[in-house]
Amino acid sequence: MVEARVHTGAATTKGIIMTTLNPYLGFRGNAREAMEFYQGVFGGELTISTFGDFQASVEPDEVDLVMHAQLTGDAGVVFMGSDTPKHMDYAEGSNFSMSLSGSNDDEAQLTGYFGELSAGGTVLQPLMVAPWGDSFGMLKDPFGITWLVNIAGPGASA
């Protein structure tokens, strides 16, 4: 297992904490292979957590699938990915989302984004405390784009 660590999104510009926006790629059973490939291309640090790490799998044969992976490349490229469980829709070619993340200091802003993006769309996962301690929610906006919102839990380090 690769060290499990979740990105807090606490990027700074001149000391100001800001929300980060990253692509989030979806895969069907080969997220680890894909993210390791991208690490070979971009270098940097790759962290991976499985569904089993958080007892979050619905199917017993999915415990070793990637629940969350993050690659921070040598040149600052940051993107994330995961395996899409069998019970969720998956279509190759449209297997990406946008991820908004920030610290608990950004909670009001990120909660506002969640509400505004979901207006006229569909909340797929309400914004609530997740097994890893952060607040997390997922929605599909009125234009069909899936958004993931993650707010670092209290005491999370940047």
Regions found by a protein language model. Give the residues of each.
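Vicinal oxygen chelate
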Residues: 2-19, 47, 67-72, 77-82, ...
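Short glycine/proline-enriched turns and hinge-like loops at secondary-structure junctions
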Residues: 61-62, 91-94
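Core segments of cupin and vicinal oxygen chelate
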Residues: 16-17, 25-76
